[in-house]
Design a protein with these regions (language model features):
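Low-complexity, acidic/polar, glycine-enriched regions of mature
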Residues: 25-204
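C-terminal segment of classical bacterial N-terminal signal peptides
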Residues: 16-24
Length: 204
């Protein structure tokens, strides 16, 4: 066999091996969990029509199953505004975190849409989900980028903020209480939310 033919054969075999060994994202048995250490969830509040403040929830739990069902828990006790007294007021008067443990987000996504993505590749999609707080629910649509990473990991990032009205989850009374306690003229009733979630394969 000539050197050129040998080289071509090696390249062809290598390509076939790479395709055969590439893991399938849309495997029914696959399951991912949210990596809390690297994931982020932020929201912006605006007071007195002029001052915007970025806050976060520091504890996120969630999973994505091989059939595309996903769930995310945003623990309310983990709210971090950068000011401790404000955190406590939000937990007590806005979220009632002793009764309501978390925002719960549920939805589904067709994993077939990303099954051919290789590590480093990404694509944009719209996630349809339901947010629940206590007995209140809100349907949302979230434009996201889904990136396939090494080791079967996924990254799901909001393309633009998801804007949530406080009235949709019956939070207006809590907002009024916070405004009164802080001596503010106003607190905006629409809240932009962004997220950057890393999902890793669930270990057995």
């Amino acid at each position: 066999m000539s050197k050129a033919l040998l080289t071509k054969a090696v390249i062809t075999l290598g390509a076939i091996f790479a395709l055969q060994s590439s893991p399938s994202i849309a495997s029914e048995g696959q399951e991912w969990i949210v990596d809390n250490e690297t994931s982020h969830f932020h929201f912006v509040s605006v007071k007195n029509n002029a001052i915007g403040e970025v806050s976060t929830f520091e504890t996120l739990k969630g999973h994505l199953s091989g059939n595309g069902q996903f769930a995310l828990e945003i623990l309310l006790d983990s709210v971090n505004t950068g000011i401790e007294i404000r955190d406590q007021r939000m937990k007590e008067h806005l979220f009632d975190s002793k009764t309501n443990v978390a925002f719960i987000v549920n939805g589904s996504f067709d994993l077939e849409k990303i099954k051919d993505q290789k590590a480093g590749e990404s694509s944009q999609h719209t996630l349809e989900a339901t947010i629940q707080l206590g007995s209140e629910t809100l349907d949302i649509q979230a434009p996201v980028t889904i990136q396939t990473l090494a080791d079967d990991q996924l990254r799901v990032t909001s393309v633009k903020p998801v804007v949530i009205a406080t009235s949709s989850l019956k939070l207006d009374g809590g907002v009024d209480k916070l405004k009164s306690l802080a001596g503010l003229r106003s607190i905006d009733r629409v809240v932009p939310v962004t997220f950057d979630l890393y999902l890793k394969p669930k270990s057995e």
